[in-house]
Amino acid sequence: MLALRGRRGKRVRYPADGVAEADEAFVLPRPLRRGVRFLISLGAGRIRFPNHTGTVAAAAFMVATGLYGMSLGGHTQSFAQVSTTAAGFAIEDVRVSGNAQTSEIDILQQLGLDGTTSLVALDIEEARRLIGELPWVETVTVRKVYPGTIEVVLKEREAFGIWQHGSDLSLIERSGSVIAPLRDNKFASLPLFVGRDAETAAAAFYDEFSRWPEFRSRVKAFVRVAGRRWDLRLNNGVVVKLPEKDVARAMSVLAGMQDTHQLLERDIAAVDLRLEDRTTVQLTPEAVKRREVALKAREKMLKAQEKRI
């Protein structure tokens, strides 16, 4: 037999998957080769999937579709809330520190905690914002402690005085900022400032007036007049009218009259110290009547003496 021999030429290589590469006519980039081989094998039936792969894929598709729908409908937070609460992350304890005027109940109500709130789903920044809206809260720190505790650390505002504006009473800071309405006698020992703009000028005047502690203990209220000066309303009803400027001079005059004549213990209604060259003392209506009676009696006595002469 004769052996048939063809002309010797270039060898053609056949890869394992049965696809012959062209004579360097086209070569796939390396990153694409594995994917193409997978698709060819898949089409040729050499790759088989487990029996339940289709069911699992369909279920995964349905779950993904549901999550996408919840996201579009804004229900993601509700779903996370329910699922994580059921998993044992419900908020069961709220630890509050640094609070003197803010109660734990105030914080629970502000956060809307009802026993089913999830710690995982709780928005810390939103919790800080909500607690910060409480009247006494200056700063707040909120921290999650898993599995079911919130730690709240407060720094509260400090009440400096009471401000009366019209018929309303409010607690104020040194800056004059209103903290909250006055609702009980807990702060009765704080100084009372009355009038428009009194809250913003209160701290500076009160600090200056601390130079005369013997008078400060007598003051029932510091009354702001026309946004320029102060009147002192004393515990016994006497009103001391201070000048707009040079309060120290006026208080020095008042101190001298008190030491010499015990002026503030007398039956007077007001002491006017607004003018530098004079001090005016206003009597009470009862004192005025007594003075009129005394003057009339004195006139009668003088007339009687003249007749005798």
From Swiss-Prot:
Location (main, coarse): membrane
Name listed for the protein in its UniProt record: Cell division protein FtsQ
Protein purpose: Essential cell division protein.
HAMAP family: FtsQ_subfam (MF_00911)
Subcellular location field: Cell inner membrane
Residues in the Cytoplasmic compartment per record: 1-52
Pfam families, per database record: FtsQ_DivIB_C, POTRA_1
Bilayer-crossing regions: 53-74
Stated family: Belongs to the FtsQ/DivIB family. FtsQ subfamily.
Keywords, ordered alphabetically: Cell cycle, Cell division, Cell inner membrane, Cell membrane, Membrane, Transmembrane, Transmembrane helix
Organism expressing this protein natively: Rhizobium meliloti (strain 1021)
Topology versus the membrane: Single-pass type II membrane protein
GO cellular component, one term: cell division site
Example GO biological process: FtsZ-dependent cytokinesis
PANTHER family referenced in this protein's UniProt entry, alphabetically: CELL DIVISION PROTEIN FTSQ
POTRA domain boundaries: 89-157
Native organism taxonomy: Bacteria, Pseudomonadati, Pseudomonadota, Alphaproteobacteria, Hyphomicrobiales
Ranges of the Periplasmic topological domain: 75-309
